[in-house]
Amino acid sequence: MLRSSAITQGIQRSPNRAMLRAVGFNDNDFNKPIIGIANGYSTITPCNVGLNNLALHAEASTKVSGAMPQMFGTITVSDGISMGTEGMKYSLVSREVIADSIETACNAQSMDGVLAIGGCDKNMPGAMIAMARMNIPAIFVYGGTIKPGKLDGCDLTVVSAFEAVGQLTSGKITEDKLIAVEKNCIPGAGSCGGMFTANTMSAAIETLGLSLPYSSTMAAEDKEKIESAERSAKVLVDAIEKNIRPLDLLTKKSFENAIAVVMAVGGSTNAVLHLLAIARSSGVDLCIDDFERIRQKVPVICDLKPSGKYVTVDLHKAGGIPQVMKLLLDAGLLHGDCLTIEGITIDESLKNIPSEPPANQNVISPITKPIYKKGHLAILKGNLATEGCVAKISGIRTPVLKGPAKVFESEEDCLDAILKEQIQEGDVIVIRNEGPVGGPGMREMLAPTSAIVGQGLGDKVALITDGRFSGGTYGLVVGHIAPEASVGGNIALVKEGDMITVDAHKKLIQLEVDEKELSKRRTLWEKPEVKYKTGILGKYARLVSSSSKGAVTDQP
């Protein structure tokens, strides 16, 4: 029996049917599945500006496939626009709002399935969390990646603009060049074009089996993206008939597959946070140490920005995520028996994919000739992060750094010091009170890290924080330090000039202060005053878990 029969069947549901008739239902529609189309369309950001067209095509395809679509909106936040401002505190919060809104609409209206369409970073994990909670047949349609901008024969992304700020302040470029980068780095619709957070999470969702093959790397403005949205609707209607549900796909093995692909493509640190959160909603026992275990086995085989050369549309041309998955599968690094939304296994889905990457490209390397022999997202532990933290270590020349702490209580204070050239080679920059509770909202530190890179210090300093990093960040950066400063983590006890060791080889992050001194400082530490007592940020700060647990708000 369809779940929607609760609102469509029986004499007592005559008023319900009357409402449905007013939005287009006819007599013969009340026995059809009702599919919610969660539309993240927004003119706030280029990531989402093209979504309505995809939603309309998915809606039409749903009808043709024998189901009844009901479209509703959900929010988005533009990380790129809010970056470096107080507004960025709402970014991670929006993941929870998106999840809550999709769950609310679908469950309130007794929908039989949901097709979610998203573009910007938090759209993907937000939709996945909702799908896992509801466990009704579901599929995700990614809005697509942006094509690269061009200037002087070079590919540009939004990160180019952030780095240009640092280049300008250090005298490496003129203001005219900065404006030229600004005008050319984002040429149209789509999510930020490197293997940043949005493209990382879309790749993870494709690997998990909840979006169609190749769909995670398509360009937003290409015709195949429309065709993919239409086909997604048909596949979802079929999944309802077969009763294929998200929790049939979201297993420990499938999450291990997703982590492996994130490592192979050189994906964002945010994947750690989001996959932990999705797993929690799925009832899957995934922990931060699983990322380190898989990192040790899976090499980086894709040369993608931010630390590499190419952008996501180049990956698509080279074979996309299916090609990456095939290489991992043949190497024994992927579980082939995991189910996909199409009702077939990973093995079956990849059976016709070549066992070697195309010879006429340099985006995907053979598994035997990786770009890096191990994954790039290392989990470090030590007295500065007893619950762990995440370091992005690909493309860095300084995997070990011991230096004096430069301590900042906010992102703004740190950026000001960087732009005033107060950061020296060998420094360990500490930005604290930016965690899930302390921010609140765990802002991304793209502005400081890009300014550092722009000044030529990207491989000469380390930056550690209880906040997050954008998927566009590279260099020796360590985020998600847990416990965070605002709940009394040892990062709160760091003083200016303390020596800190960051050792990616030993997976160590250590404050070189003895326990006796730390205990003394701990007794003197005072919990910071709550920054937001009301509104969504106040509510979030009261509810949110540690970043080591995914920074979720629906913990029992």
Swiss-Prot record:
Reactions that this protein is recorded to catalyse: (2R)-2,3-dihydroxy-3-methylbutanoate = 3-methyl-2-oxobutanoate + H2O; (2R,3R)-2,3-dihydroxy-3-methylpentanoate = (S)-3-methyl-2-oxopentanoate + H2O
Q: Name one GO molecular function term.
A: magnesium ion binding
**Record PTM N6-carboxylysine, positions in chain:** K122
Read off the Pfam families from this record.
Answer: ILV_EDD_C (PF24877), ILVD_EDD_N (PF00920)
PROSITE patterns named among the record's database cross-references: ILVD_EDD_1 (PS00886), ILVD_EDD_2 (PS00887)
Write down the InterPro entries for this protein, in alphabetical order.
DHAD_IlvD/Edd (IPR050165), Dihydro-acid_dehy_C (IPR042096), DihydroxyA_deHydtase (IPR004404), DiOHA_6PGluconate_deHydtase_CS (IPR020558), ILV_EDD_C (IPR056740), ILV_EDD_N (IPR000581), IlvD/EDD_N (IPR037237)
Residues binding Mg(2+), per UniProt? D79, D121, K122, E444
- This protein's UniProt keywords: 2Fe-2S, Amino-acid biosynthesis, Branched-chain amino acid biosynthesis, Iron, Iron-sulfur, Lyase, Magnesium, Metal-binding
Q: What is its EC number?
A: 4.2.1.9
Q: In which pathway does it act?
A: Amino-acid biosynthesis; L-isoleucine biosynthesis; L-isoleucine from 2-oxobutanoate: step 3/4; Amino-acid biosynthesis; L-valine biosynthesis; L-valine from pyruvate: step 3/4
- This protein's superkingdom? Bacteria
Any Gene Ontology biological process: L-valine biosynthetic process
Cofactor note from UniProt? Binds 1 [2Fe-2S] cluster per subunit. This cluster acts as a Lewis acid cofactor.
**Cofactor (UniProt):** [2Fe-2S] cluster; Mg(2+)
Q: Is-annotated flag, keyword Hydrolase? A: no
Q: Which residues are annotated as active site?
A: S470
Q: Which residues cross the membrane?
A: none
Protein residues bound to [2Fe-2S] cluster? C47, C120, C192
Question: What does the subunit section of this Swiss-Prot or TrEMBL entry state?
Answer: Homodimer.
Q: Which family does it belong to?
A: Belongs to the IlvD/Edd family.
Q: What does this protein do?
A: Functions in the biosynthesis of branched-chain amino acids. Catalyzes the dehydration of (2R,3R)-2,3-dihydroxy-3-methylpentanoate (2,3-dihydroxy-3-methylvalerate) into 2-oxo-3-methylpentanoate (2-oxo-3-methylvalerate) and of (2R)-2,3-dihydroxy-3-methylbutanoate (2,3-dihydroxyisovalerate) into 2-oxo-3-methylbutanoate (2-oxoisovalerate), the penultimate precursor to L-isoleucine and L-valine, respectively.
Kindly provide the name given to this protein in its UniProt entry: Dihydroxy-acid dehydratase
